[in-house]
Structure formats: C-alpha cells, structure tokens
A protein has these predicted regions:
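An aromatic- and glycine-enriched ligand-binding surface/loop that stacks and positions planar moieties
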Residues: 32, 61-68, 80-214
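Aromatic-anchored glycine-rich loop motif in surface-exposed flexible loops
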Residues: 1-83, 94-111
C-alpha cells in the first residue's frame, strides 16, 4: 500500500496530464465542460453545457499548483513527470492564458503572467546549463543526459519508432522549415537579421545560415 505522500505524488501525475489535455482543449474551444471523474457512455455529464473559460483556466492552474507542491522533486525515475516538468507546463500555460487575456481585454491577465514568471524562474534556476549544440537536440538518437532537456520522447526499436526517414527521403520534404521560421532565428550577435551587421544575406542557404545563433 502507498503512504499519503506517495498517493499525493501519483495524484499529482494525474493532475498534470489532465491539465495538459485541458490546456489543449482550452486553446481550441475556450469554454468547455470541466469533468473531474471518469465517465461512462451513460453518464449524464456527457451532455453538460460548457463551463466558462475562467472556470476551466483556474481549474487547470489549481491542478498544476497542487502537482507542483506534492509531486516528487525528481519524479519516479529518469524521464518521468517531476517538479520541473510541472513548472514548465505552468510557465507555458500561464504565458498563453495571460497573453490571451491581456490582448482580449479579459480580467486576471496579470495573475497568469506573474505565475508564468515565477515558474519560469524556478526552471531556469534548475537548468543553468544548456546543451551547446542546437542541432543535436533534434538529430540525436537519444536525448538522455543532455543538458537542458526537461522531458523527452524516448524511442525503442520494435517498441516505439517514428516515420521521419520515410518523410524526408523525397526531394520535397513535408516538414521543412519555412522561410519565416528560418528568418526568426537571431544572428550570433544577438540581433535579428534586419538589424545585424553579421547577417550573410539571402544569396543562398549557406549565406543565410552563416553567423546565426543556433
């Protein structure tokens, strides 16, 4: 049997995933029903009206703050949900919700933005060193042990793989970066391409990638 601390930890893991799913739905639909227990095909809650955005957003934040307080600092082992993972989701959710409220003239924007700032500082203080090779964050067979990686998807032969090689074997890849995405990267001097004296120009891709911060 589990003691109270272990129960609170696993409840926190459940709250994390519920908050993650609700965050995705909130960004799509705004108002939606908030459900706190398992439903069956006969549950009357399937026909509930939508709850206001304020209620859903506050419940998401409440779940995440409970998880932050009660989850094991290092999770249940390597690459599991731990306190830093929860704080990262608090940061991302509150940045989204706070800016949405700010630019749509909704109340309580500052509350979410301040939570974003607080949680972000906690994560930054824990991960003080980042991996120096940006490309390896996307091309490595495993992200285990790489500085700055908070949570990653781990692949295993015959268990969990992906179809990346199939998608990039043709002349026209389905997942190439757009020109806007490439242009959004700063130059090595910290300035955007329009303000940098180190930008190589648009003559070819080699010039575009020269002296960029990646």
């Amino acid at each position: 049997s589990m003691n109270d601390a272990e129960k609170a930890h696993w409840r926190s893991v459940g709250y994390f995933f519920r908050a993650y799913k609700y965050f995705k739905m909130l960004s799509l639909y705004g108002d939606l029903p908030w459900v706190e227990h398992t439903l069956s095909e006969d549950s009357e809650e399937l026909y509930l009206p939508r709850d206001p955005r304020d209620v859903v957003a506050q419940n998401i934040l409440n779940n995440l703050k409970y998880a932050e307080e009660h989850i094991k600092v290092d999770g249940d082992g390597n690459n599991t949900i731990n306190r830093a993972v929860v704080q990262s989701l608090i940061s991302r959710f509150c940045l989204f919700e706070g800016t949405w409220r700010k630019y749509h003239a909704l109340p309580n924007a500052t509350t979410y933005l301040e939570e974003c700032t607080r949680a972000s500082k906690e994560v930054m203080n824990k991960y003080t060193t980042l991996h120096p090779n940006y490309e390896e964050l996307f091309n490595s067979e495993s992200l285990a042990g790489i500085n700055g990686i908070i949570l990653y998807k781990e692949y295993a032969t015959s268990q969990l793989c992906h179809g990346l090689t199939r998608m990039v074997r043709t002349g026209e890849s389905q997942i190439e970066a757009t020109k806007d995405a490439v242009d959004s990267y700063l130059c090595s001097d910290g300035h955007p391409i329009k303000n940098s004296t180190t930008y190589g120009g648009d003559k070819d891709v080699y010039a575009q990638f020269r002296n960029r911060d990646y």
